[in-house]
Amino acid sequence: MANIHIVIPARLKSTRLPNKMLADIAGKPMIQRVYEQVTKSKFDSIIIATDSQKIKDIAKSFGAKVVLTRDDHQSGTDRIAEAVTKLGFADEDIVVNVQGDEPLIPIENIEQAAQLLIDKSEAVVSTLCEKITDVEDIYNPNNVKVVFDKNNYALYFSRASIPFERGFSEKEQINISEFFRHIGIYAYRVAFLKHYAELTVSPIEKYEALEQLKVLYNGYKIAIEQSAKSTPAGVDTLQDLEKVRKLFNV
């Protein structure tokens, strides 16, 4: 039986909120909050993959297993792929990518992503989404939208509003069609991760700045379904950080 692992990619030099992995949340760095949240799951191992000696030292201090990776990776998936190779995981194993800036991610969603990949044998990656209910979220490029087929395989991810119903105003769109926000959690087959770095980088991946488009561009399938629980947005800005701090201080 395949083992299931959680890997948390943690980059120190984030662009929008520098050093956010070490940002204080109710007396603990954010990376520790994320780690403590995922330890509530029952997977085989939990690893932090980072390019920072500082993050590694802090993570070791609270008992985490850490893999130090290169600092030139273009995405969290690239970082995880290196970590998986170093750790020697078996090809049949599954790795769940939990973002290091999501301290409030529901455990149910982590487990759901892993189970979805187990159930969808044609997919090499699985992920989750949730229905958009606020029209402003449709047009916010920070909210990645996704469309998928009747068998729950992703067709496309975009920062633009997809789908678009021609002939209706922006405000009317949400009443005409369903829109889904992509939730940035992924489960991967280890065999796929081991050759991920060899895949062709696609123009659309660069245009949209969405790493998952590399998977689709190279002809692989991504399974997707609506999340069991609503997932709070990750911490990308100072405003996001303040919201999370308030929730932990309640």
Curated annotation (Swiss-Prot):
One of its GO terms (biological process) is lipopolysaccharide biosynthetic process. It is found in: Cytoplasm. It catalyses: 3-deoxy-alpha-D-manno-oct-2-ulosonate + CTP = CMP-3-deoxy-beta-D-manno-octulosonate + diphosphate. HAMAP family: KdsB (MF_00057). This is 3-deoxy-manno-octulosonate cytidylyltransferase. The keyword Cell cycle does not apply. Keywords: Cytoplasm, Lipopolysaccharide biosynthesis, Nucleotidyltransferase, Transferase. Activates KDO (a required 8-carbon sugar) for incorporation into bacterial lipopolysaccharide in Gram-negative bacteria. Its main location: cytoplasm. It is an enzyme of class 2 (transferase). NCBIfam families: kdsB, PRK05450.1-3, PRK05450.1-5, PRK13368.1. Pathway: Nucleotide-sugar biosynthesis; CMP-3-deoxy-D-manno-octulosonate biosynthesis; CMP-3-deoxy-D-manno-octulosonate from 3-deoxy-D-manno-octulosonate and CTP: step 1/1; Bacterial outer membrane biogenesis; lipopolysaccharide biosynthesis. Belongs to the KdsB family. One of its GO terms (cellular component) is cytosol. It comes from the Bacteria. The gene is kdsB. Gene3D superfamilies: Spore Coat Polysaccharide Biosynthesis Protein SpsA, Chain A. Transmembrane segments: none annotated. One of its GO terms (molecular function) is 3-deoxy-manno-octulosonate cytidylyltransferase activity. Its EC number is 2.7.7.38.
